[in-house]
Amino acid sequence: MKDVTIIGGGPSGLYASFYAGLRDMSVRLIDVQSELGGKMRIYPEKIIWDIGGIAPKPCHEILKDTIKQGLYFKPEVHLNERVVDIRKKAERHFEVETEAGEIYTSKAVIIAIGAGIINPKQLDVKGVERYQLTNLHYVVQSYRRFKDKDVLISGGGNTALDWAHDIAKIAKSVTVVYRKEDVSGHEAMKTLVTDLNVKLCPKTRIKYLVGNDDETHISEVVLEHVESGDTHTVKFDDVIISHGFDRCNTLLSETSSKLDMHDDCRVKGFGNTTTSIPGIYACGDIVYHDAKSHLIASAFSDGANAANLAKTYIQPDANAEGYVSSHHEVFKEANKTIVNKHLY
């Protein structure tokens, strides 16, 4: 039996993992995705400005460090596992069950599932799956791959316009198609992309994807006007789909442990990351409490708070907070290496 099971491997879950390890707790970390990082993996190239003391840098760089930190104390990690139930069997005895039927036991549970399981909405076009490993994209991992390319973006929201704005600076051309009369993203961003010669095509959708000779890459796209039905075919090097996300949050509605909720979509926190069930804590975007702000920096704070509360639940005579890292014995040897690196 582990001390704590953390459900969710985004920034809050990862920091909870680190801080629980710092407090000498054994940790199990479960995530439904194939990689850790949560929603931060959706915008790897975006620049993050609002983490205190951290210079602005691409999200993927912050994510790399966050994962490294979260794994520092060697938690037991389970990826590609969807949690379907949390059962409190007794005080300091919880069962966490996955869709595959695995049952994991721990003394406490921390829920850090963000806004739930997030998957990009797929393009509903016949044969689309054959291009997903080549030049059809649902997430922009790197802007550099679009240098000097003709790029099509389907979607009119903020994310689509953000991508159009950034890619237009290096691409040969960028075209944005969307079904409505106007984009739903910020008006200021529409002006910015227009100034970069991004072609905006209202009331237009992707009807067909035309592959190359071996059907491994998209070579042309058949576009259709949603009102007239008129079509035309255009050559593109890459196609990006930005149709929003499907979110699955059934764990909270179906679990045996019925938690008090805020607006039916977030766990109600009582002053902090404490939930209505002793021994279950919630951190990050999934929890609502009076001091809540939806920032990565706040997710870190939530994670530490949840780990501290789990520690005192498991061990009532433990200190309410851990020692600051600058004076913590657990980092003594690692600190020597860091000091030597900077001095010599």
Swiss-Prot record:
Belongs to the ferredoxin--NADP reductase type 2 family. Keywords: FAD, Flavoprotein, NADP, Oxidoreductase. GO terms for molecular function: ferredoxin-NADP+ reductase activity; flavin adenine dinucleotide binding; NADP binding. Its EC number is 1.18.1.2. Binds 1 FAD per subunit. This is Ferredoxin--NADP reductase. Homodimer. InterPro entries: FAD/NAD-bd_sf, FAD/NAD-binding_dom, Fd--NADP_Rdtase_type_2, Ferredoxin-NADP_redctase_2. It holds the Pfam family Pyr_redox_2. It is an enzyme of class 1 (oxidoreductase).
